[in-house]
Amino acid sequence: MSEYLSVTSLTKYIKYKFDQDPHLQSVLIKGELSNFKKHSSGHLYFNVKDKNSVISAMMFKGNASKIDFEPKEGDEVLLEARVSVYERRGNYQIYVNKMHMDGIGNLYQKLEQLKKKLTKEGFFDQNHKKVIPKFPQKIAVLTAGTGAAIRDIHTTINSRYPLAEQVQINTLVQGEQAKSDIIEKINQADALNVDTIIIGRGGGSIEDLWNFNEEDVVKAIYNCQTPIISAVGHETDFTLSDFVADVRAATPTQAAVMATPDQYELRQYLQQANLSLTRFIKQYMQQKRKHLEHVASYYKFQTPSLLYDQQIQKRDDLEKQLKLSLNLKIKNQQQQLQLLFNNFNLKTFKQRIKRDQLTNNQKRVELSKVMHNLLDNQKNNLARKLENLNNLSPTNTMLRGYTIVNKDDKVITSTKDLAENDNIVLTMKDGVVDAQVKKVRCNDE
């Protein structure tokens, strides 16, 4: 007669088959989150679905804490998980190890999170922006060595302000190596003592422009001492490099316009300034000539002796008064000096010095006693605190028979943080024990 299996036995057998299948231990799944719930324990429970199917899923707290975004109902996600059977209900489900946003949505969310972080840290503050020089002598251009961007920048600068020397620094603007190359070239340009730096490239997708959203690139632009114009992408494209740069240009051509004055406008301005200056000088000379003619007509200038006769007499009177004043001052100083000399008593002065020395010695002894007493009190107080601290240390606590429980490198303080089959580490006074939870019993059960 055939032996009947219990439901539990059959379920355990099916679970065993799932757990032994290597293809089910690490699977990559793409789908939409539904029925998403975050338990008070920190574990996540949800379904993953597409148009035709639904799979139950859960994610333990330790793995959930590593998610780099805030998952919610309806998110399209990429999952790395293992497939197993939940014995209590007898259905299969996935246990998720890693979760990421699917595709471009992840990039936009990452961009927004980084923008908020850098804004909070002050990287985009206006008070950090540097002024672009009006008349640059040397401009560094950081972009790809070939393409429309470098051609437009060179053509525009040569047309507007050929006096400016252009330093072309070929830079990777796309690909895995671009981030480090952009940072290196920014530092290189900053060390060249140029007046302005233009960072530019043509348009592209968010993936193409992503190197200009990297935090390290933003910090390199922020720390650069040379004013920077960012011209990354087209007019509708925005990167974090645009926000941190001193000026943002919609296109590489506009960046070249912002970096230079227009030579034709300068010539027109200089011509106008020359006319205005010439007209001002003529008017000024006419005014001064009229004033000189008016002054020359005064009667004193017609008889020059009237200008200095009275001044000579006034000088003689002042010289006489000065001599009398000096003689009187010298006499008074001599009388005061003689009076001080007569009143000076050398013996009294020595006695006062000796008395002050005795007073100082007494105060020195008293101060030394106070300092020794204070130092002894501080030493005794420190010894008592060290003794109290030693009594409260975890090592002394374990010497009295207590054990510290850790799970996922975190100290467990409540049975509510544990579940059956959890792997835990017990730290005792003489070593460490790796253990597994068989059953959890709470005091309120």
Curated annotation (Swiss-Prot):
It is found in: Cytoplasm. It holds the Pfam family Exonuc_VII_L. One of its GO terms (cellular component) is cytoplasm. It catalyses: Exonucleolytic cleavage in either 5'- to 3'- or 3'- to 5'-direction to yield nucleoside 5'-phosphates. InterPro entries: Exonuc_VII_L, Exonuc_VII_lsu_C, OB-fold_nuc-bd_dom. It comes from the Bacteria. Its EC number is 3.1.11.6. GO terms for molecular function: exodeoxyribonuclease VII activity; nucleic acid binding. Transmembrane segments: none annotated. One of its GO terms (biological process) is DNA catabolic process. Disulfide bonds: none annotated. The keyword Cytoplasm applies. Keywords: Cytoplasm, Exonuclease, Hydrolase, Nuclease. Bidirectionally degrades single-stranded DNA into large acid-insoluble oligonucleotides, which are then degraded further into small acid-soluble oligonucleotides. PANTHER family: EXODEOXYRIBONUCLEASE 7 LARGE SUBUNIT (PTHR30008:SF0). Heterooligomer composed of large and small subunits. HAMAP family: Exonuc_7_L (MF_00378). Belongs to the XseA family. This is Exodeoxyribonuclease 7 large subunit. The gene is xseA.
